[in-house]
Amino acid sequence: MANSGLQLLGYFLALGGWVGIIASTALPQWKQSSYAGDAIITAVGLYEGLWMSCASQSTGQVQCKLYDSLLALDGHIQSARALMVVAVLLGFVAMVLSVVGMKCTRVGDSNPTAKSRVAISGGALFLLAGLCTLTAVSWYATLVTQEFFNPSTPVNARYEFGPALFVGWASAGLAMLGGSFLCCTCPEPERANSIPQPYRSGPSTAAREPVVKLPASVKGPLGV
């Protein structure tokens, strides 16, 4: 019962992390315009993501444009795209395996050991999905930080962390935490099929004593 509760907790944590990974992948606010220091606050806020760039007007109107060319993008954007897509796919497979392997489902009840191993496999894939997300988000954030503190970057062209990065960090943490809980599920040891036999006492000592037969030529002391 304890393992079943731990599986449910891990599954819902990892599922929430996977949904957050999808949201982080789709959001265009991976980096946004910086207004720190001497930067002039303009009426237009710029956002950039993995798939598009957006401009937000002071009136609330937002205009977004998809990137025109795939090959013309920077290497870190292409790498982040690949890692996030892989994380989404791994999370989907992990979700299916976890549902099959959890004790609260009816699939594979005839083999509890194999069922637990399937749940552990799902947890491992959730861990990989969270690791891919963490790598992509942290790498992107590192480049944004380097560009921000680069003296050659104009003040009005500097960017800061966007909300999508924080969503990605939180989602990666949830996916890895939930995957860890699923991996902590220990398979049940196989029980021996043999039925214990009742104890039977051995034959008595008297029955084990050998019977000595005298030859016919030997007679007793009375000559009988």
Curated annotation (Swiss-Prot):
One of its GO terms (cellular component) is apical junction complex. It is a multi-pass membrane protein. Its main location: other. Expressed in the corticomedullary axis of the TAL, specifically in the cortex and the outer stripe of outer medulla (OSOM) zone (at protein level). Expressed in peripheral nervous system, in Schwan cells (at protein level). Disruption phenotype: Mice are born in normal Mendelian ratios. They develop peripheral neuropathy associated with defects in the electrical sealing by tight junctions in Schwann cells. Changing A39S: Strongly reduces interaction with Clostridium perfringens CPE. It is found in: Cell junction, Tight junction; Cell membrane. The keyword Disulfide bond applies. Changing Y35S: Abolishes interaction with Clostridium perfringens CPE. Changing I41L: No effect on interaction with Clostridium perfringens CPE. Signal peptide: none annotated. Changing Y159 to S/F: Strongly inhibits interaction with Clostridium perfringens CPE. It comes from the Eukaryota. The keyword Coiled coil does not apply. Forms paracellular channels: coassembles with CLDN16 into tight junction strands with cation-selective channels through the strands, conveying epithelial permeability in a process known as paracellular tight junction permeability. Involved in the maintenance of ion gradients along the nephron. In the thick ascending limb (TAL) of Henle's loop, facilitates sodium paracellular permeability from the interstitial compartment to the lumen, contributing to the lumen-positive transepithelial potential that drives paracellular magnesium and calcium reabsorption. This is Claudin-19. It comes from Mus musculus (Mouse). The gene is Cldn19.
